[in-house]
Every structure is written in structure tokens, then in C-alpha cells.
UniProtKB/Swiss-Prot annotation:
Textual note on the cofactor: Binds 1 [4Fe-4S] cluster. The cluster is coordinated with 3 cysteines and an exchangeable S-adenosyl-L-methionine.
Database matches in InterPro entries: Aldolase_TIM (IPR013785), Elp3/MiaA/NifB-like_rSAM (IPR006638), Methyltransferase_A (IPR040072), RlmN_N (IPR048641), RNA_MTrfase_RlmN (IPR027492), rRNA_lsu_MTrfase_RlmN/Cfr (IPR004383), rSAM (IPR007197)
Protein name as annotated: Probable dual-specificity RNA methyltransferase RlmN
Function, in words: Specifically methylates position 2 of adenine 2503 in 23S rRNA and position 2 of adenine 37 in tRNAs.
Active site: 89, 333
EC numbers, comma separated: 2.1.1.192
Organism this protein belongs to: Dictyoglomus thermophilum (strain ATCC 35947 / DSM 3960 / H-6-12)
Length: 348
């Protein structure tokens, strides 16, 4: 069955016209789905009864099912189950009157970064558009009942967004457009490990979302040790694509940098990173490593973290130290799913 959350409004209009219905019915349907968050056609009372029945027969309105919720302070992590029984994770961070949802785009991940829990079991499959949008609708419904709503969406959960390009871009359009969830493009961030051709392609879209790039090292030798795909898309090519995106969209690019003790957190690494990014339209997010038992790394010492940050700041680079809100609830990417798979005997 066709899930309603996979369609944009023009596609719904075309279907309705094929049924002999006026196209404005699409606006009414989407008002119920995205504004009132009603996922039951029988409750769409301004539609003719016959049309409601036809919609129910043609479309499904399913969203992912909640398996488990863990919470710590202002962070909630949702372990979700999809229709085929696969599991993904979604995180809600509520902070200073903002509600940020972190969504997954794949079941697992094929990149195999040597510090990330998501890639431990590889890639199962891409998420469909409705499975991405469904995560956001799930959280929006929960907040809506409290008189609140989502303010930001970040594509930073499980999987590499640019390796599920079409479904991710369509989901962004659905949540961004006025007929959808109407979340502004400056409040949507896509995070990528650095799939260079797709960064250029994204720059040509009419989206202008914020771009975050997982850099994690100041040179190719170090980066290739923890990010295998760096051998295909080395840092110099990655930076070229990032600066192109910034110029094309007018959006400053964020570089994510996970600090790993005695690997990429030394003074010389900070100086080298500053040399790459100085006088560029960028922001750097420093992230203390969130421990994953399967990897040997340790979190950097605080004194080294602050020294690293100061070197970047002194070079005139905008830099933020990201607080790890979800470390105790295993809210690092893929950690809750990994624990769940272990409990089922699917991960050693």
C-alpha cells in the first residue's frame, strides 16, 4: 500500500484528478496530516465520505512503532520498529525553548567509521521517504499534545544521508514546504561523512538546508584510519565541495570534529585544522567522543579539549564545544540499536 507520507502535494493532486476529484482536496488532506497530525482518513470530516473511504483503501498512514524510550534530562531516545521488523533510532533534544529531532536515514550504515556504533552490523537497507518523515511526525504528535512543536530537524542519526539521496531530499521537501510541516530550511541540517559528488548535487537543489560535514581529522593520513571512504573522497576534495556549497547556498558549513584522546586531539592537530579552515565561511563543532565498548578509543581530557578549542578560536574560527546530552542513555549514533541487537543475539 502507498504510504501518504511518501508523497508531495503535486503527486497527491495528480492522483485525485485521476479519481475525478478537485485538486484542492490535496490541500485539505495535507492540512489534516501535517497541521492537525490526523493519520486516520475517517476523521477528515471536511472530505466526502466516499473520498475518505477511497483514501483509506489506497493509502496507508503508518508511522514507525515505538519499541523503547530512554531519557536523561532534556534528551529522549526512541528505539523504533519499521514495518519489516527492522529497528532505527530517533532522538529528541529539548533545550532553551527549542525541540530538535535527530532522524535516521538508513538501517545501519555502510561507511564503517571506526568510532561509530551504527556501522557495527553494516547496512541493512535505505529508509523510504515515509519512514524518514514518519519519525518526525511521531515526535511532532507527541509535542503537539503538550502544546509544543519541533523547531529543528537534523539528519544526523543512523546512516549516511547522501547515500540515500532521493528519499532524503524528498523528505526534506515534505517537512520544509508550507503544505508540509513548514520547518524553515535554516532549521534543517544534513550531516554527511563527505560524499563529494552528492554535496555538489545538493548545492543545486532548491533547499538551502544547513550542511554539516563529519571531518574528525586535519589530514588524510589520520582521517583514512577512522573513515575508510576518505581514500575515495580525500580532505582537499571534500573541502572544495563544502566551500562550493557555502557559496552556492549562502549557508555557512559546519564541520563536526569528534575528539579522540591521543589520536586527533593534540595541539598540532588543532593548528593543522585551523590552517585548513581559517578565513572560510565555516563553523566547527567539537564533540568529545561518546564511548562505544567495541572500539579502543578514550574520551579526550578536558584540558586538551579546551586547548584545542582555544587554538581554533584564536585563529578566528567560529567554534562550539558540543555538550553530550545523551551519553548515559546511549544516545550516541547507533548505540541504543546496538544494545537492542545484542539482546536479540544479532550482535556480539
Amino acid at each position: 500500500m502507498n504510504n501518504i507520507l511518501s508523497f508531495d502535494i503535486d503527486e497527491i493532486r495528480d492522483i485525485l484528478r485521476g479519481w475525478g476529484e478537485p485538486s484542492y482536496r490535496a490541500d485539505q488532506i495535507f492540512d489534516w496530516v501535517y497541521k492537525k497530525l490526523i493519520l486516520n482518513p475517517s476523521s477528515m470530516t471536511n472530505l466526502p465520505k466516499g473520498l475518505r473511504q477511497k483514501i483509506a483503501e489506497y493509502f496507508s498512514f503508518d508511522i514507525p512503532k515505538v519499541v523503547k524510550i530512554t531519557g536523561e534530562g532534556n534528551t529522549k531516545k526512541y528505539l523504533l520498529e519499521l514495518e519489516d521488523g527492522e529497528n532505527i533510532e530517533t532522538v529528541l533534544i529539548s533545550h532553551k525553548n527549542r525541540n530538535t529531532v535527530c532522524v535516521s536515514v538508513q538501517v545501519g550504515c555502510a561507511i564503517g567509521c571506526k568510532f561509530c556504533a551504527t556501522g557495527l552490523v553494516g547496512l541493512r537497507r535505505n529508509l523510504n521517504t515515509h519512514e524518514i518523515v514518519g519519525q518526525i511526525i511521531l515526535i511532532q504528535k507527541e509535542l503537539f499534545e503538550k502544546g509544543d512543536r519541533i523547531s529543528n530537524v537534523v539528519y544526523m542519526g543512523m546512516g549516511e544521508p547522501l547515500l540515500n539521496y532521493d528519499n532524503v531530499v524528498k523528505s526534506i521537501r515534505i517537512i520544509n514546504r508550507e503544505w508540509g510541516l513548514n520547518i524553515g530550511s535554516k532549521h534543517i541540517t544534513l550531516s554527511t561523512i563527505g560524499i563529494v559528488p552528492k554535496i555538489y548535487q545538493l548545492g543545486e537543489e532548491d533547499l538551502k538546508v544547513r550542511l554539516a560535514i563529519s571531518l574528525h581529522a586535519p589530514n588524510n593520513e589520520l582521517r583514512s584510519k577512522i573513515i575508510p571512504i576518505n581514500k575515495e573522497y580525500p580532505i582537499e576534495k571534500l573541502l572544495e565541495s563544502a566551500f562550493y556549497y557555502a557559496e552556492k547556498t549562502g549557508r555557512r558549513v559546519t564541520f563536526e570534529y569528534v575528539l579522540i584522546k591521543n589520536f586527533n586531539d593534540r595541539e598540532e592537530h588543532a593548528i593543522e585544522l585551523a590552517g585548513l579552515l581559517k578565513n572560510k565561511p565555516v563553523h566547527v563543532n567539537l564533540i568529545p567522543w561518546n564511548k562505544v565498548p567495541e572500539y579502543p578509543w578514550e574520551t579526550s581530557d578536558l584540558k586538551d579539549i579546551f586547548k584545542f578549542k582555544k587554538i581554533l578560536s584564536d585563529a578566528g574560527i567560529n567554534v562550539t564545544l558540543r555538550i553530550s546530552y545523551g551519553s548515559r542513555i546511549k544516545a550516541g549514533c547507533g548505540q541504543l540499536r546496538a544494545l537492542y541487537l545484542k539482546s536479540k543475539g544479532e550482535l556480539k
